[in-house]
Curated annotation (Swiss-Prot):
EC numbers: 1.10.3.2
Matching Gene3D superfamilies: Cupredoxins - blue copper proteins
Record protein name field: Laccase
Lineage: Eukaryota, Fungi, Dikarya, Basidiomycota, Agaricomycotina
Binding residues annotated for Cu cation 3, in chain numbering: 132, 421, 473
UniProt superkingdom: Eukaryota
Main location (coarse class): secreted
Keywords annotated in UniProt: Copper, Disulfide bond, Glycoprotein, Lignin degradation, Metal-binding, Oxidoreductase, Repeat, Secreted, Signal
Length: 520
């Protein structure tokens, strides 16, 4: 090996290592453009501190996070502005730091920075962060976020839980989102921990996750997906789920997990098999499916095993995850009374699509020029006064809310995973089930709304205890871009007093509004 080759190998190894060094709770996140080739195909991307996925942001329950986002973007085709959502955090009192562009803030302009400053008093678990401006996260601005609980009630179930036990899944495209089709027909590659192969790049490196025989690992599985859901499994190993979207759950043993865009699961893996190499599989629900040539795959490698690709084979799952089998570890009261519609406010979400745009109850979400939060702070007090017209729903304070999402062939691309900002919700009716569980359903923040073929009518409940405008949207980013969203303006009279905004937040809009369109 020449000196140049060894230097190159060192640089590549260093870059790979950077992705594993956690930052936080106080950190700079520098957003820029760079050429990357995570699956062996080189393209320009949006990177965080020079890597995609971005570095793990980590802290402890009770921490104050001060995350300074520095916008050094230069490539207009992937947008030069940005805005970052810290997915799964309630942001109580800091609605201005939630991140969705034109709902909670104006974007950060290139050449500027913005400090997201928020408290995490009572949440712990697995989260993530991503651009919430147009389809920018599909081009690379996404990464994992973990809040550790020093008093984790599941601590006795595992031996190892660290930077190296985070597993990210991402769909990767060889064409920038704005230069490709509005609705791609599948990703070119699935990246596991930032590495993968496409059918045309089957020599690319795969991620290797190392374990020591006899140890129990808490793996934190994070879907950074823009579109497909993935069926995740590890040959020869069961997975014991203990956390769902940052909610501790009763341990549930499964052998495969269908994980939808933006969902998270912690599972315990007992490294009790023969020393060797085992395939880790994440099969997308459409596009380049299967595992030929090592696509949609990574490697679980026991210490002492040869550094070779696995020869293990996949067995048909006998214990696939079924959402109705998930239950919170601690008792969590379901809002409302235990009957259909037994709430203060029940809203049905009727989906539609016209070939280019998605609609909810007849309205397609078009980002307003003035963020909804700013509209409210500026004096708008009624849903009918808030823009975009037809897409903002006023919710009273301290009320029990029920939302139903009947699956319909009128909204293609199902199953649509829906995410509610500012809350976790009880899933009282899950996809694939006709049963309503008001006793001990799982709480989470992203739910599959199922399929029309199954006759699904997924139903969730939450309580309005967090004043502010909160986005509810399909987390298939291409569908959100096509208007598949509404805003819940929660407790409008108290929004301004509950969420005092910093001057830097107020400065975002005039700076952004002065930009030429090519600099946005």
């Amino acid at each position: 090996m020449s000196r140049f080759q060894s230097l190159l190998a060192f640089v590549v190894a260093s870059l790979a290592a950077v992705a594993h060094a956690a930052i936080g709770p106080t950190a700079d996140l520098t957003i820029s453009n760079a050429e990357v080739s995570p699956d062996g195909f080189a393209r320009q991307a949006v990177v965080v501190n020079n890597v995609t996925p971005g570095p793990l942001v980590a802290g402890n329950k009770g921490d104050r996070f001060q995350l300074n986002v520095i916008d050094n973007l230069t490539n207009h085709t992937m947008l030069k502005s940005t805005s970052i959502h810290w997915h799964g955090f309630f942001q109580k009192g800091t609605n201005w730091a939630d991140g969705p562009a034109f709902v909670n803030q104006c974007p950060i302009s290139s050449g500027h920075s913005f400090l997201y400053d928020f408290q995490v008093p009572d949440q712990a678990g697995t989260f993530w962060y991503h651009s919430h401006l147009s389809t920018q996260y599909c081009d690379g601005l996404r990464g994992p976020f973990v809040v550790y609980d020093p008093n984790d009630p599941h601590a006795s179930l595992y031996d190892v839980d660290n930077d190296d036990t985070v597993i990210t899944l991402a769909d990767w495209y060889h064409t920038a989102a704005k230069l490709g089709p509005a609705f791609p027909l599948g990703a070119d590659a699935t990246l596991i921990n930032g590495l993968g192969r496409s059918p045309s790049t089957t020599a690319a490196d795969l991620a290797v996750i190392n374990v020591t025989k006899g140890k129990r690992y808490r793996f934190r599985l994070v879907s950074l997906s823009c579109d497909p859901n993935h069926t995740f499994s590890i040959d020869g190993h069961d997975l014991t789920i203990i956390e769902v979207d940052s909610i501790n759950s009763q341990p549930l043993v499964v052998d495969s997990i269908q994980i939808f865009a933006a969902q998270r699961y912690s599972f315990v893996l007992n490294a009790d098999q023969d020393v060797g190499n085992y395939w880790i599989r994440a099969n997308p629900n459409f596009g380049n499916v299967g595992f030929a040539g090592g696509i949609n795959s990574a490697i679980l490698r026991y210490d002492g095993a040869d550094p070779v690709e696995p020869t293990t084979t996949q067995t048909t799952p006998t214990k696939p995850l079924n959402e109705v089998d998930l239950h919170p570890l601690a008792t969590m009261a379901v809002p409302g009374s235990p009957v259909a519609g037994g709430v203060d406010t029940a809203i049905n979400m009727a989906f539609n699509f016209n070939g280019t745009n998605f609609f909810i109850n007849g309205a397609s979400f078009v980002p307003p020029t003035v963020p909804v939060l700013l509209q409210i702070i500026s004096g708008a007090q009624n849903a009918q006064d808030l823009l975009p017209s037809g897409s903002v729903y006023s919710l009273p304070s301290n009320a029990d809310i029920e939302i139903s999402f009947p699956a319909t062939a009128a909204a293609p691309g199902a199953p649509h995973p829906f995410h509610l900002h500012g809350h976790a919700f009880a899933v009282v009716r899950s996809a694939g089930s006709t049963v309503y569980n008001y006793d001990n359903p799982i709480f989470r923040d992203v739910v599959s709304t199922g399929t029309p073929a199954a006759g699904d009518n997924v139903t969730i409940r939450f309580r309005t205890d967090n004043p502010g405008p909160w986005f509810l949207h399909c987390h298939i980013d291409f569908h959100l871009e096509a208007g598949f969203a509404v805003v819940f303006a929660e407790d409008i009279p108290d929004v301004a007093s509950a969420n005092p905004v910093p001057q830097a937040w107020s400065d975002l809009c005039p700076i952004y509004d002065a930009l030429d369109v090519n600099d946005q």
